Amino acid sequence: MTDQPVRRRNFLQTTAAVAGGIILASPAVVSAEPAEPTAIEEPFHGAVLNRRHGEEVDEGLKIQVRGRAPLRDRVTVNGTDARRVGNRFVSQLVLREKETEIVAVSQGSSGRREHRVRVLWDRHSQPRYRFSIDDNSFFLRDIAQKKYDSLFDCFYLKMLRELHEKYKARFVLNIYYTTEDGFELPQFPDRYKAQWRESSDWLKLAFHAYANEPARPYQYAPAERLIADLDKVAEQIRRFAGPETYSPPTVIHWGMVQPAALKPLAERGVRALSGYFQRVSTGWDVNYLFDDDRSEYLSRHDALKDFQSGIVFSRVDIVYNNTPLNQIVPTLEPLAKDPNHAEIMDLFTHEQYFWPFYSNYIPDHAQRLDAAIRWVTEHGYKPVFFHEGLLGGAE
């Protein structure tokens, strides 16, 4: 019984020490938590910025740079102190070069952090539109089989020429190598080459795919297969229509390719690729297999540059075979009011819906094109080809 007080005293001392240890350890636990990252949120990496995204100043474009950083850190953007509001920061920066790297640096008790993004300045931007027609093969087969005296005896090309004469419209026709009934491009004669050449200022031909089927032919295919098919079609275009008529591809069938194919495409002259960048139940689709962040950004913006390949990606604004005639203007009008969509109109449709024998033939398809081109023309948009300059604009 004599050692009982001692044991009680030791117990109390031990308990106090343990409790003290917990209290003393608390600050260490807090300090070990990861600090908030420093990140530039606007502009987005790869953003294509034009006059609508900032203020035009002498030889430059003044933009806002926004982001987040640890609360007490000092933040600089390209060497200039940023204004802090809570964990946010904002700074102004003048773009003076075609490409600019933006560097945000934060320094504080947790050390130094930085985040970098690169943006592209569309210095000579102007309102412009590109008209692309996918899945072309029927008109080539029609001309080859009927042996017309002129290319424009084919109603399809005649319609496009009338739109050109009326509005100065330009078109790029994305073509297949073969049709399902066995027609192939080598069967198309070269006797129309002079007409193709004379029309090459407003009418171009480009590779789309080897054939319409199977669907998504390049989504899982190696780059070598895509490039081989591209080369076959390009060779034939140059043979029967001349190099003046050839355009590097701007839309790959289904808008899905392996990331490893982008650099080889760029080496074949591809400067721009268009897609839908649309959200579906399984994720993002017709997006060239971009990651979620870039796909989401492109769903809300005109364009984004992939610096690794050098290709600029464009979001298709409207698909006319899916848009009723009375919905064309209501679809275009809000785009023209949105600074992220207003500068460049990427207009799009598919050839097969013009042909009466096609199961889903659209009788007013030509009227839809006329309504759209009339609207963009009346609102000051100029026709361009995306493979020329920066999305058809001067560089």
What are these regions (language model features)?
Residues 10-30:
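N-terminal export signals
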Residues 26-43:
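C-terminal segment of N-terminal export signals and the immediately downstream linker at the start
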Residues 170-258, 280-282, 347-355:
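Metal-dependent polysaccharide deacetylase catalytic core of the NodB/CE4 family, i.e.
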Residues 272-277, 347-395:
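C-terminal domain-boundary segment and adjacent tail
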Residues 93-99:
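Surface-exposed, short loops/turns at beta-strand junctions within beta-sandwich domains
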Residues 116-197, 347:
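Active-site beta->alpha N-cap acidic-glycine motif
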Residues 181-185, 244-245, 254-347:
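Active-site-adjacent pocket scaffolds in enzyme catalytic domains
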Residues 1-6, 19:
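Secretory targeting signals
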